[in-house]
């Protein structure tokens, strides 16, 4: 039987298909790293004062100098559309690899503070760049409350809760410890409801969960960078595999943590199946 030559697909068509696939992958990768995702969650507690039932808290973490829209306008509009009562900045506004200037944080902080009362704690990247005191002073002048190992009271509906914040452990060797701050909180506040803003997610279980806060709010973990089903992400910021405590709510020692997946990337890192997150927490009295 005579053999017939196999028909070959034109080489040009194969190249075109590969180019289209490459463009689709590039588009998806860009979308994964630059398309904002509003994540709405509810934190319920019977200890929450009635006046704070329905309070809206926007959490922004780990921007690392990222820009969403011209002058961050897309991010600012997204935050404003949530009508927040409070905005919490959970550290790493700046990035040591890009050497993000203070002006980035100050401009963003000023515009966020025009939307709602805004509170900030440092992350490890702030301390890897020069002159943290100057950054804190500039943010304060811009209308942002810097919680450097201290606490403030928040008021709503005739009730009060307490918000405390700690500097990143990469700060000064003699800075107040979280445990010392917690002692001050309990001395001033007794058994009242309080929140703790602290950058590092990986310190919740061993340390922050033992301080007595009702809710600890953190970032740092970048959602595990690559989100896979049934995992907390693939890679930690310390470059270990399958990290824990990277996104959402966790409970330890009668305390709850909310961990933001964050917004930006540090240096050569990236996101996959893990879009930049604007977290919107609704406090609920249950």
Spell out what each predicted region is:
Residues 38, 54-56, 160:
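Short, mixed charged/polar active-site loops
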Residues 1-51:
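N-terminal membrane-anchoring alpha-helices
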Residues 53-57, 174-177:
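Short, charged, solvent-exposed linker or helix-capping segments at domain edges/interfaces
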Residues 47-48, 65, 127-215, 221, ...:
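Conserved catalytic scaffold of divalent metal-dependent phosphoesterases
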Residues 50-52, 81, 112, 155, ...:
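Short, flexible hinge/linker loops that cap or flank conserved catalytic cores
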């Amino acid at each position: 039987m005579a053999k017939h030559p196999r028909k070959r697909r034109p080489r040009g068509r194969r190249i075109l298909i590969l180019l289209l696939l490459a463009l689709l992958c590039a588009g998806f990768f860009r979308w994964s790293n630059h398309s904002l995702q509003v994540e709405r969650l509810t934190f319920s507690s019977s200890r929450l004062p009635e006046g704070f039932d329905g309070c809206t808290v926007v959490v922004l973490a780990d921007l690392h100098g990222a820009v969403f829209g011209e002058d961050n306008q897309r991010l600012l509009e997204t935050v404003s559309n949530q009508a927040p009562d409070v905005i919490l900045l959970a550290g790493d506004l700046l990035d040591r690899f890009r050497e993000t200037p203070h002006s980035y944080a100050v401009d963003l902080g000023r515009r966020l503070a025009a939307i709602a009362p805004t509170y900030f704690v440092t992350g490890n990247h702030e301390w890897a760049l020069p002159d943290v005191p100057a950054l804190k002073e500039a943010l304060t002048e811009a209308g942002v409350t810097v919680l450097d190992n201290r606490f403030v009271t928040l008021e709503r509906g005739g009730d009060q809760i307490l918000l405390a914040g700690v500097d990143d452990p990469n700060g000064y060797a003699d800075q107040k410890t979280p445990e010392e701050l917690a002692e001050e909180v309990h001395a001033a506040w007794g058994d009242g409801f309080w929140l703790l803003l602290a950058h590092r997610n990986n310190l919740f279980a061993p340390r922050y969960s033992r301080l007595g806060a009702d809710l600890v709010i953190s970032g740092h973990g970048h959602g595990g960078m690559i989100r896979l089903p049934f995992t907390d992400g693939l890679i930690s910021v310390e470059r270990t595999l399958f990290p824990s405590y990277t996104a959402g709510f966790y409970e330890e020692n009668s305390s709850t943590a909310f961990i933001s997946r964050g917004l930006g990337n540090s240096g050569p890192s990236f996101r996959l199946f893990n879009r930049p997150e604007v977290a919107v927490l609704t406090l609920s009295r249950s």
